[in-house]
Design a protein with these regions (language model features):
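Non-catalytic, surface beta->alpha helical segment in thiol-disulfide oxidoreductase systems
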Residues: 94-115
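Boundary at the C-terminal end of the N-terminal hydrophobic targeting segment
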Residues: 19-21
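Structural micro-motif
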Residues: 81-94
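Solvent-exposed, polar/charged alpha-helical surfaces in well-ordered, non-transmembrane soluble domains
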Residues: 46, 50-53, 72, 76, ...
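Bacterial N-terminal signal peptides
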Residues: 7-16
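Thiol-based oxidoreductase modules, predominantly thioredoxin-like and allied folds used
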Residues: 58-75
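Local sequence-structure signature of Cys/Sec-based thiol-disulfide redox active-site neighborhoods
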Residues: 24-60
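Bacterial N-terminal signal peptides that target proteins for export
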Residues: 1-7
């Protein structure tokens, strides 16, 4: 029985450290990288990513549905920028330290990101 508990303890430690490594957003070394917070099923997120690829822009996408660390990072950045999270629409973009949220006019939002 002691062996079972030792094995359970070791497996718990292994999965705990592996799980944390997978969900932590890596720091962006290059300040010329656009960070997108969104959902892989969001049509606005899909359209924005396609536009950035077409425009040859560097970006990183974080799925805030599954990555709670990225979600908290996004909320912290919005709070620091004094942007309300009430009725927030995705995608949310950090473009070189300036935060942008999806507005009523998606075309204008995308133009701000790609310019």
């Amino acid at each position: 029985m002691k062996g079972f508990y030792r094995l359970l303890f070791i497996l718990t430690l292994l999965f705990q450290f592996n799980g944390n490594a997978q969900i932590t957003p890596s720091p962006i070394k290059n300040s010329k990288v656009i960070v997108i917070y969104g959902s892989p099923d969001c049509h606005y997120c899909i359209d924005l990513k396609k536009t950035l690829v077409d425009q040859n822009k560097n970006f990183v996408f974080y799925d805030i549905d599954t990555n709670k660390v990225a979600l908290n990072e996004m909320l912290t950045k919005l709070s620091r920028a004094k942007i309300s999270t009430t009725n927030l629409q995705i995608p949310v973009v950090d473009k070189y330290g300036v935060m942008y949220v999806n507005s009523a006019n998606f075309k204008d939002f995308v133009e701000k990101i790609v310019e």
